[in-house]
């Protein structure tokens, strides 16, 4: 009887070791990356940053520029310097005005004290999922639109 109990314990330990080995081999093969929900979260973060910059421009009665950097995949607030950093597996593109207020515009979305903006669209994508963050040039309003490619 005593020998049988020890043998059962040895079987359980062996099975657990095999399961752990299989998990170590299989788990890295499961694709990890930005989910649809997290991609939408990034879109919401960027929209909130843009809305904050618009509000700051109205509040301080001075233009505020939100800076987009495609190389580092960042969106930086012109009001408080906060940054939304996108991971490398997220596609990041923007459609921006070439001229605004009679002057050339770089990689920024400018907001004016009147609430107006130069407008633009920021596009986030991963595989067949995408979101557009659109800034209306006339009202400065910000909206998020699903842009799935399925």
What are these regions (language model features)?
Residues 2-3, 13, 21, 25-59, ...:
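N-terminal helix-rich module
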């Amino acid at each position: 009887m005593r020998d049988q109990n020890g043998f059962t314990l040895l079987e359980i330990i062996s099975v657990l070791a095999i399961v752990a080995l299989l998990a170590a081999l299989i788990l890295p093969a499961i694709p990890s990356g930005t989910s649809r929900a997290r991609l939408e979260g990034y879109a919401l973060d960027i929209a909130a940053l843009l809305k904050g910059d618009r509000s700051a421009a109205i509040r301080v009665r001075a233009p505020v520029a939100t800076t987009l950097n495609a190389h580092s995949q960042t969106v930086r607030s012109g009001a408080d310097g906060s940054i939304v950093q996108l991971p490398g597996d997220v596609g990041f593109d923007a459609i921006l005005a070439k001229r605004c207020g009679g002057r050339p515009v770089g990689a920024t979305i400018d907001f004016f004290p009147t609430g107006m903006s130069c407008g633009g669209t920021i596009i986030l994508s991963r595989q067949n999922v995408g979101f557009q963050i659109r800034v209306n040039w006339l009202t400065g309003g910000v909206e998020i639109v699903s842009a799935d490619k399925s």
